[in-house]
Amino acid sequence: MSTWKAVERSIASLLGGERVPITGRIRGSAPDVEHPWMSIEIKHRKGGLPKYILDSLDQAHKSAKQDQLPVAIWHKKGKKYTDSVIMMNLGDFIEHFGV
């Protein structure tokens, strides 16, 4: 099994979902993971995330109090605030939402 398929399968399992095979799927017609309340698209990269994104998540973690969920929000100038992207570590997501 290829690495990206194994990554999709492992993350699907962590979230209580099931990987959707790509066979017969048209891009955008189905998520990578079948889940009751989330549409999950997984991206796996050899190089990882850019440092500025990792730094923002690290800053959120360092400033979070005990019961706070550390998130980083990225807003693109000129876009609506509700179109901003929210990021968090998967482990924090699972712990907070009890998935």
What positions do the PLM features span?
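Catalytic phosphate/metal-binding cores of nucleic-acid and nucleotide-processing enzymes, i.e., regions
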Residues: M1-V99
